[in-house]
Swiss-Prot record:
One Gene Ontology MF term: proteasome binding
Assembly with partners or alone: Binds the proteasome.
Keyword Lipid metabolism: no
Alphabetically ordered keywords of this record: Cytoplasm, Nucleus, Protein transport, Transport
Region (Disordered): 24-68
Highest taxon, organism lineage: Eukaryota
GO biological process: nuclear protein quality control by the ubiquitin-proteasome system; proteasome localization; protein transport
PANTHER family documented for this protein: FI02826P
Protein name: Tethering factor for nuclear proteasome STS1
Length: 292
């Protein structure tokens, strides 16, 4: 009588090497009745049967099966490494996450402040330029760009730009900034950004820009005074005269709103006998430097 067929079991993702060999054709399945008859043979008969059976080469397993087994066993569910996880976040989300962690632990906050590289003048200006560009992007497509409607659309982004400008301005002032040349360089480029701020038809709306000029004027004054202390009477020899040319042009573009710092720097250089080598050449050079 024929024996019953034994069903094959192959659950999902459970790799069985012998089953894989059968599927790939490396060995045919043994019929159930032949398998059952072999199991009933006595040990003596089995030895006799093996003596008469011709020897055969050992069956080779496919390297593909071995490779698939290794890959399947190495594929495991696991979370992303921290570097991959953080790289998937946009800058705003990453900053918010880091600020939240620092707010919960003062030691972590101090450590982050210690290990984070200080911004350069170039990197700071990149941030500020993007912030001002975002404000200009909020202008209405059509209509008057100087009326109250346009102002209230742009105002939140302008205030964010001014908040960032205030933070960076404080950072680049001495004594926090130890290099006076960096302070002058930042002020030069930051003042150019202030020139770009929108001009409104309403005087009340223009107060934002006017107040910003007032802060910039104070900053120029502080840096000029610090430069005078450090150079000890050698301002003309230290290249500060070049900043006078820039400040003169900035004052012109601002509508004479930087006159306090300009007069201070001019008086300090005059006391040391500084005179521009060629006023007309200096003016032309400043024209090229101040494209705003």
């Amino acid at each position: 009588m024929m024996g019953s067929v034994v069903p094959l079991s192959s659950p999902a993702w459970d790799l069985n090497l012998s089953a894989g060999q059968n599927l790939l054709g490396h060995g045919s399945p043994t019929p159930s009745h032949s398998r059952k008859r072999r199991l009933s043979v006595t040990p003596e008969a089995g030895d006799s049967h093996m003596e008469h059976e011709s020897p055969s080469k050992p069956r080779q397993q496919s390297p593909f099966v071995h490779k698939r087994a290794r890959v399947t066993r190495q594929l495991q569910s696991r979370p992303l490494p921290m570097s991959r996880l953080l790289s998937s976040l946009d800058q705003k989300t990453l900053v918010s996450l880091l600020e939240g962690i620092c707010a919960q632990d003062d030691r972590v906050a101090r450590q982050v402040m210690e290990v984070t590289p200080k911004p350069t003048v170039s990197s700071a200006m990149d941030v500020l330029s993007r912030a001002l560009d975002q404000a200009f992007a909020l202008f209405p497509y059509k209509g008057d760009h100087q009326n109250d409607y346009a102002f209230f659309r742009v105002r939140p982004a302008l205030e964010e730009f001014l908040a960032e400008l205030s933070d960076y301005l404080s950072h680049f002032l001495p004594p926090n900034e130890t290099q006076v040349s960096n302070s002058f360089a930042f002020l030069d480029q930051a003042t150019s950004l202030v020139h770009r701020m929108p001009q409104w038809s309403s005087p009340a709306n223009n107060r934002l820009k006017e107040e910003t000029y007032e802060h910039i004027d104070v900053a120029w004054t502080l840096v000029c005074e610090e430069a005078a202390k450090r150079q000890r009477g050698s301002l003309a020899m230290s290249g500060v005269g070049n900043w006078l040319i820039r400040l003169e042009k900035h004052n012109e573009l601002s509508g004479d709103r930087l006159k306090t710092s300009l007069h201070l720097l001019r008086d300090m250089l005059d006391d040391q006998g500084y005179r521009p080598p060629n006023p007309f050449a200096s003016f032309n050079g400043a024209q090229q430097l101040f494209t705003v």
